[in-house]
């Protein structure tokens, strides 16, 4: 019953607003586009909040602002309005006697919450010392036909916030702050790599062979070529082709797509940084990553201590570096896991089954060890930690370790028990790469939907010679979650994947 009443109220209010718009149309141009502002709300606060009232009065500072009406208090012949623009809010004082004859009654009197207006006026301070603009000229720029959510008492319904992000951005200052932080993360990353001599590039989104990661791809069809194609799951193989071609430092900030589950940590469409550096190894990349994250924290938050929920991550001190085996033995001791369990297939199967892990037929020892790590150790990696020495079986593109060829020169960055990044010294042995691709094909034929496709052209590229190279991918969405203190990945993606409303 309440919903019906609310719908009737909404329809009634929209009818009134449409009538006001019709009256504007009858007068002429209902959507003018000639007003030009010369100031933003936050800039005015920054520049004039500390100026004394008398000084403002003497200076007679004239400004032009534009934005959305968020609140309105009518006090007879004057109205106080809160105006919101992209930078923040500022108060307007709109009085009948300061405007041309008839404007206050005929124009301002018909303004509604949500309308977009342009205002010219002078700065002053109210009795409560609030910086305010005394309007001398006003313009209705856009008539809002729908009222703000809940008369702007807030927008708390989570699903509505995701489906109608524009309302969320209007109503919730925290959401606007989150996406400003996300933008700063991306800008900071781009600035860092350009300053280090990297070249930004773009590689195909539509691919004949989806490669560069183990994941289930989205499939589409190219009508003109009459061929199935895939949305990319990673740009890795194309970026390494560029290193073969002589671009020795490259990076890309772009979207990847993986046809997998949706959760607070996963969205099928997500943003990644991938970069490749010739004549470097995975140790160099770990150093780069520490430096980058420390810089981002300082630039965005002004400190290397990053608050996240009840936790605080310290980006100021060296990140811990630990191998996968070391992590399992450290955090799996209570389950009775010993070193020998990680080097024998049957013993590893027994440990996995004891932990309740569903062992897949296609798994070898490396996959078992990885599954055991995810079960007993991953969630313990709270402070920034580089996990190293992953099994070669689960790292088909990474260079084998010189001392132990069963593992690779690879790392994953964990913060708060979540993987944030993945990097390794690149496999540049074309014959070894070909064999590993064949192993991935066998795994796919055995039922592993996430095993990699074989890319013959990439093997050909390696045969021309890839210099010693290291590469890394960092999840932008998860970094944004960290710096914005957001609990869900949907909170940092402007338009997250949502099931269609029935």
UniProtKB/Swiss-Prot annotation:
Q: Does the keyword Protein biosynthesis apply?
A: yes
| Enzyme Commission number(s) | 6.1.1.6
Q: Name one Pfam family in it.
A: tRNA-synt_2
- Per the entry, which co-factors are needed? Mg(2+)
- Sorted UniProt keywords: Aminoacyl-tRNA synthetase, ATP-binding, Cytoplasm, Ligase, Magnesium, Metal-binding, Nucleotide-binding, Protein biosynthesis
Q: Where in the cell is it found?
A: Cytoplasm
List the catalytic activities from the record. tRNA(Lys) + L-lysine + ATP = L-lysyl-tRNA(Lys) + AMP + diphosphate
Which PROSITE patterns does the record match to this protein?
AA_TRNA_LIGASE_II (PS50862)
Q: Which InterPro entries match?
A: Aa-tRNA-synt_II, aa-tRNA-synth_II, aa-tRNA-synth_II/BPL/LPL, Lys-tRNA-ligase_II, Lys-tRNA-ligase_II_bac/euk, Lys-tRNA-ligase_II_N, Lys-tRNA-synth_II_C, NA-bd_OB-fold
Q: Name one GO biological process term.
A: lysyl-tRNA aminoacylation
Family per similarity comment: Belongs to the class-II aminoacyl-tRNA synthetase family.
Q: What is this protein called?
A: Lysine--tRNA ligase
């Amino acid at each position: 019953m309440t919903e019906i009443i609310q719908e009737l109220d909404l329809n009634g209010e929209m009818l009134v607003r449409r009538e006001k718009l019709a009256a504007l149309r009858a007068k002429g141009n209902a959507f003018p586009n000639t007003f030009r502002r010369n100031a933003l709300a936050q800039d005015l606060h920054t520049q004039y909040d500390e100026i004394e009232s008398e000084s403002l009065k003497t200076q007679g500072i004239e400004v032009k602002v534009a934005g959305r009406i968020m609140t309105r208090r009518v006090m007879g012949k004057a109205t106080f309005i809160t105006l919101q623009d992209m930078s923040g809010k500022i108060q307007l004082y709109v009085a009948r006697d300061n405007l041309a004859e008839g404007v206050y009654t005929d124009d301002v009197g018909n303004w509604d919450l949500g309308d977009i207006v342009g205002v010219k006026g002078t700065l002053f301070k109210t009795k409560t010392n609030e910086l305010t603009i005394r309007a001398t000229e006003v313009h209705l720029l856009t008539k809002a036909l729908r009222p703000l959510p809940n008369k702007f008492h807030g927008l708390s319904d989570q699903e509505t916030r995701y489906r109608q992000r524009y309302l969320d951005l209007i109503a919730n200052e925290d959401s606007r702050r989150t996406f400003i932080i996300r933008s700063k993360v991306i800008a900071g990353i781009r600035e860092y790599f350009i300053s280090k001599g990297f070249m930004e590039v773009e590689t195909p989104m539509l691919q004949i062979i989806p490669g560069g990661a183990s994941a289930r791809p989205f499939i589409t069809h190219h009508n003109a070529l009459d061929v199935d194609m895939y949305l990319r799951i990673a740009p890795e193989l194309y970026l390494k082709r560029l290193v073969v071609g002589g671009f020795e430092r490259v990076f890309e900030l772009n979207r990847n797509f993986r046809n997998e589950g949706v959760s607070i940590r996963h969205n099928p469409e997500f943003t990644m940084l991938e970069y490749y550096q010739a004549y470097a190894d995975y140790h160099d990349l770990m150093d780069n990553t520490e430096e980058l994250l420390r810089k981002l924290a300082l630039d965005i938050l002004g400190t290397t201590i990053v608050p996240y929920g009840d936790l605080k991550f310290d980006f100021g001190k060296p990140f811990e570096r630990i191998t996968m085996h070391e992590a399992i033995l450290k955090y799996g001791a209570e389950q009775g896991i010993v070193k020998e369990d990680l080097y024998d297939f049957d013993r590893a199967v027994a440990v996995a089954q004891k932990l309740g892990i569903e062992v897949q037929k296609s798994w070898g020892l490396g996959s078992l060890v990885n599954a055991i790590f995810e079960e007993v150790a991953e969630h313990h990696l709270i402070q920034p930690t580089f996990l190293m020495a992953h099994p070669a079986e689960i790292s088909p593109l990474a260079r084998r370790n010189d001392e132990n060829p069963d593992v690779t020169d690879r790392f994953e960055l964990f913060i708060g028990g979540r993987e944030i990044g993945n990097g390794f010294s690149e496999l540049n042995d074309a014959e070894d790469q070909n064999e590993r691709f064949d192993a991935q094909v066998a795994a796919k034929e055995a039922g592993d939907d996430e095993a990699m496709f074989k890319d013959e052209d990439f093997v050909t590229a390696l045969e021309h010679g890839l210099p010693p190279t290291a590469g890394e991918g960092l999840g932008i969405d998860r970094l944004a979650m960290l710096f914005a203190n957001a609990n869900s990945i949907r909170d940092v993606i402007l338009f997250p994947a949502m099931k269609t409303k029935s």
